[in-house]
């Protein structure tokens, strides 16, 4: 988990916000559950109490500060319950949207674009893993024209 967090902190993340979230998440994670990515809201003016989204290999966790930041509300959704994930990019940031199989839609707005893209990519990988049983490898396909040229040479 520490290695993942070091990688996340290199991507314009607020170290204090990440540290606060991870300290509270440690007691919430199930056995064999690993944090894949954490995205923290960054509103245009001042973000005093940002919402955040944590994606793990087992679920999506929404973290919302309550009572002037003195407490935190966690709402989680297992990957089995997720129907799809989406990213909508705007001028001041991106929205990460996911819908459940019971047709509930959740949106976290004002995420930095880079963070929203990484969140979306990780979510798609987890949904693909759940759907197909294995993650699809990144295969560089050779165009048919190159294959035909190789066949003619033989």
Label the predicted regions.
Residues 1-13, 17-29, 43-48, 70-154:
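Acidic, Ser/Thr- and proline-rich intrinsically disordered linker/docking segments
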Residues 41-72:
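Conserved beta-hairpin
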Residues 33-38:
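A short, Trp-centered hydrophobic/proline-enriched beta-strand micro-motif
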